[in-house]
Amino acid sequence: MVMEKYLLELGEDQVVDISDYTFAANFIWLGNVSGFYATIEDCFCLFAMSGSELSMLLPPLGKLKNLKKAINKCFEIMNSNNSSPHYSRIDYVAQCILEKFAKMLDKDASIFDVFADFIFEKKLVDYIYKADDLISLHGNAYHTKRTEINKFTNTYPNFKIVTLEPEKHAQEIITLSNTWVQNRLKYTPKEQMDDFMEGMYQEKAAIKRMLEYYQKLELMGIVLYIDERLQGYTVGEKINEGVASVLLEKTNFEVLGCAQFIFREFSKILSSQYSCEFINVGDDMGFENLKKVKMSYHPYRLNTKYSIYQKI
């Protein structure tokens, strides 16, 4: 695929393990976004249109030596289209790409030195864990997780995990997802409601797109049944040779321990199938409760993602 080709041109020593840098992730999550890609300075450049304003969903991907020239040209394109340069930005910029480019120019340079004409806004981080930690849950740090899983298996001995098959499970997955949103609305603070609903609108579209293109995107997923009723599902993919990612996960949060159990079991499957050392569960979308859950699994590292604006 075109995007993967340009990712490889970053170089073998520049492995990007952020969840946004795969075709599948962009395809399912951006199904409702108008946009286009272009080759600029021999880089893959992905643009999105919101209303009449143009922005970029990823930084230019390709040979690092072309990065800054491509960024400058992309801002020229956005500025010529937008009603104000303030709307022009590049999202989901991996810190590691910027740092590698800066060091290529000067081993002592920082990204802020090299990109002095730009404003960097730290937006989100990807949570990355050691697969073995998520599988073994060893030590006091994971005591609560082990307890929750034990309660689940003792309370629901009739659970069953099977491979996700969209033609069999699609309607049950959509029903569970809708129920999850309805239940979560009861606990969402009013000041977060607009952001929550926007996030859920995007996720609903992503779930439908995932189910429709599951096979073509070569995704992997499992569903969890209790007494013949679907109570959870999760879907992931391989990012690179060392890292797999979890793209989507939903469980009935009235079934205690269900989320912890399916996450551990899926971690086993991802590790076995892809021989990966790390598992990336994406970012927290800016939701504090999701941040707490992801931090409770003690990430091995947090990969920073920036939005970049041009100084005006």
Model features per residue range: what roles?
Residues 218-311:
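Aromatic (often tryptophan-rich) hydrophobic motifs at membrane interfaces
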Residues 77-130, 134-135:
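A basic- and aromatic-enriched beta-loop-alpha substructure that forms the phosphate/nucleotide-
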Residues 97-118, 147, 285-302:
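Conserved active-site alpha-helix within GNAT-family acetyltransferase domains
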